[in-house]
A protein has these predicted regions:
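ATP-dependent carboxylate/acyl-activation modules
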Residues: 1-189
Length: 189
């Protein structure tokens, strides 16, 4: 019912504490065209997770609108020696293969965020590329600075906060956080 309300095609993601990296357990299916496809995908995801992690708990499934753009990763955490920092780079499932990332200490300014983007080997993907319009860099920079501020405001409770992927739309379309993974510090720390 939720998929029909959002409008097809949709993305489906499994919700389980044992599936923090959903793609690694087959917990993401994109471009589902109708309700029957959503149901079949959910059943297949649950079966795959059960085969990989027999004690896994499936809390449900998340249905999301399909969005297009350039996939980025933004992450913030605290290093015990150097303090809080941000990592930004090309995201989605390619982040570990490409390792196209930049680092900065927090707090992050808009100029520092732009500098991080300028360091990326794949920065051309954020501009006009192969007939596609340029991406919304202003919105991406605002998201980077906002994530820096959010982490610093809540660092007493947050150990790590990762947005992957953050979809960067065309100019004027903004950015969309498709998956966010917070890691909270143990109580009493």
């Amino acid at each position: 019912a939720e998929a029909a309300r959002i409008g097809f095609p949709v993305a489906l993601k499994i919700v389980s504490p044992q599936a923090s990296h959903k793609t690694e357990v087959g917990g993401v299916t994109l471009g589902l065209a109708d309700e029957a496809a959503v149901i079949a995908a959910a059943e297949a995801m649950a079966a795959r997770l059960a085969a990989l992690e027999p004690d896994a708990v499936v809390e449900g499934f998340l249905v999301q609108e399909m969005v297009s753009g350039v996939e980025m990763i933004l992450g913030v955490r605290e290093d015990p020696q150097f303090g809080p920092f941000m990592v930004a780079g090309l995201g989605g499932v390619t982040v570990e293969a490409m390792r196209d990332i930049a680092f900065r200490m927090l707090p992050l300014t808009a100029g520092e965020a732009q500098g991080m983007l300028d360091e990326l080997r794949g920065k051309a993907l954020l501009g006009a590329f192969r007939g596609r319009p340029p991406r919304d860099i202003a919105a991406l920079i605002a998201a980077m600075v906002g994530l820096s501020d959010l982490f610093l405001d809540h660092r007493a409770h947050l150990a790590d906060l990762e947005v992957n992927p953050l979809i960067v739309g065309s100019v004027g379309e903004g950015v969309r956080a498709v998956d966010v993974r917070p890691v909270f510090k143990p109580a009493g720390n």
